């Protein structure tokens, strides 16, 4: 009945103000109104009581809904709830009052883990918390007793022949740059060489044959350091057996391969990584001409070492390890051999073999000294052709050429004491070099010239001095 009464009141609200416009008036109107209200209520409950009950119920619902949200506010709804109930009015809850409130409006939070909590949602636990060891269930259908004492280890597959050459070639080429044998040994230990250990000396020697003398010296040192750590003496013997077998193919790319391999064998015997009877084991059993030449070269070097020559000097000392006096002698011999043979390409090759590009100014200096001390035109022309060829091939750089000429310019007064006509010869040679494009105009203009000596009787301007007595 209450629900039906509320629906009827919603459709036809019994407002006393609105009933004032009815057709009845006076006491009849009031009596009719009270009779209608009593009929509508049914239970003889006044309409004002129903309206007041509805307002109070609505205020209670709002109070329960907002109690959790506004629990932290200073002026909560509960403080004013009793006043609202007593007055019959609702307290408006505008969203503007919660504009800067960072708390969740649903009252449940965002579901994030606790900050600094121990064991909350998404947290591993307190620092230092030890978890229990997971015990294996023996009755588990998937239980395997072999897994209890199982030790796992990283397995590196052995290298095949193609991967071996592709992997080790950059390692050896980088070694020629830094020269650190320990780094190469560490990198080789990380690889599973397997049966390819004997291929390390073969590949290193093959690359050194195409390089310089310093590279061959570094290769001999590398083989000596790797023997005993990465490979054994047996692996070294197998590698040199393969080198002697492959000498015909190596000689196609490097004609001097037989002599160089013989030097490698002699150095290996001297370092103790090859036995002394290695060469004797090949006597009378070698049919290859190149292999026989290599063994003969090694035999000669070993016999020389018995007479006092060190076996570690088979490659010489290359690059900056050579002394200045030794380099000066080598350059002087190079120029003298060139003047005898006239072979410019051989002279250029010998200069590159010295591996001292920072010392090429010495060749320019010694060559010009030979021109100044010569008496014929052949030396003048041959030295000019040599410097021109070295300049065009960029064997001698601009700085080295300039430094060699400047040394001559600074020492020409002392040279002139031993060579009287050195000034005139130098001026002529410098002019020819400028015409050939060897030196620049600025360097030519720096050439010193010696003026004509005046006689005692000549004064300034060539006039005779007046008698002063």
Curated annotation (Swiss-Prot):
> Motif Phosphodegron: which ranges?
70-76
Its recorded name reads: Programmed cell death protein 4
Expression by tissue, per the entry, reads:
Up-regulated in proliferative cells. Highly expressed in epithelial cells of the mammary gland. Reduced expression in lung cancer and colon carcinoma.
Species this protein is from: Homo sapiens (Human)
What top-level branch of life does the organism fall under? Eukaryota
Localization (cell): Nucleus; Cytoplasm
Q: Which residues carry this modification: Phosphoserine?
A: 25, 67-68, 71, 76, 78, 80, 94, 313, 317, 457
The sequence motif named Nuclear localization signal is recorded at 58-64, 241-250
Provide the taxonomic classification: Eukaryota, Metazoa, Chordata, Craniata, Vertebrata
């Amino acid at each position: 009945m209450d629900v039906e009464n509320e629906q009827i009141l919603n459709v036809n609200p019994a407002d006393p103000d609105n009933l004032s416009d009815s057709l009845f008036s006076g006491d009849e109107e009031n009596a009719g109104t009270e009779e209608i209200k009593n009929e509508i209520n049914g239970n003889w409950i006044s309409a004002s009581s129903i309206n007041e009950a509805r307002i109070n119920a609505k205020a209670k619902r709002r109070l329960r809904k907002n109690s959790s949200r506004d629990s932290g506010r200073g002026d909560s709804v509960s403080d004013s709830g009793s006043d609202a109930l007593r007055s019959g009015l609702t307290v408006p809850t505008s969203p503007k009052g919660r504009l800067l409130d960072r708390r969740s409006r649903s009252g449940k939070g965002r579901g994030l883990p606790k900050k600094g909590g121990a064991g909350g949602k998404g947290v591993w636990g307190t620092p230092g918390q030890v978890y229990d060891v997971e015990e294996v269930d023996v009755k588990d259908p998937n239980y395997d007793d072999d897994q209890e004492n199982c030790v796992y280890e990283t397995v590196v597959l052995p290298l095949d022949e193609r991967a071996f050459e592709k992997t080790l070639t950059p390692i050896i080429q980088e070694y020629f740059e830094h020269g650190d044998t320990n780094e190469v040994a560490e990198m080789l230990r990380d690889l599973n060489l397997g049966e390819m250990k004997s291929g390390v000396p073969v590949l290193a020697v093959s690359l050194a044959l195409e390089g310089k003398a310093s590279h061959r010296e570094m290769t001999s040192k590398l083989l000596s350091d790797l023997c005993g750590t990465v490979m054994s003496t047996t692996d070294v013997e197998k590698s040199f057996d393969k080198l002697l077998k492959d000498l015909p193919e190596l000689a196609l790319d490097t004609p001097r391969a037989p002599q160089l391999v013989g030097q490698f064998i002699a150095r290996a015997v001297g370092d103790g990584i090859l036995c002394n009877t290695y060469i004797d084991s090949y006597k009378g059993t070698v049919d290859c001409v190149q292999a026989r030449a290599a063994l003969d070269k090694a035999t000669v070097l070993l016999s020389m070492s018995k007479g006092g020559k060190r076996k570690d000097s088979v490659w010489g000392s290359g690059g900056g390890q050579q002394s200045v006096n030794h380099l000066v002698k080598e350059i002087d011999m190079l120029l003298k051999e060139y003047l005898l043979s006239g072979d410019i390409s051989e002279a250029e090759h010998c200069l590159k073999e010295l591996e001292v590009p920072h010392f090429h100014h010495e060749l320019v200096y010694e060559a010009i000294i030979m021109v100044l001390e010569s008496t014929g035109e052949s030396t003048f022309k041959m030295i000019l052709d040599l410097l021109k060829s070295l300049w065009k091939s960029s064997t001698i750089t601009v700085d080295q050429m300039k430094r060699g000429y400047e040394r001559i310019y600074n020492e020409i007064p002392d040279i002139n004491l031993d060579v009287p006509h050195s000034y005139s010869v130098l001026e002529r040679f410098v002019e020819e070099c400028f015409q050939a494009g060897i030196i620049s105009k600025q360097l030519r203009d720096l050439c010193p010239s010696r003026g004509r000596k005046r006689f005692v009787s000549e004064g300034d301007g060539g006039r005779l001095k007046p008698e002063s007595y």
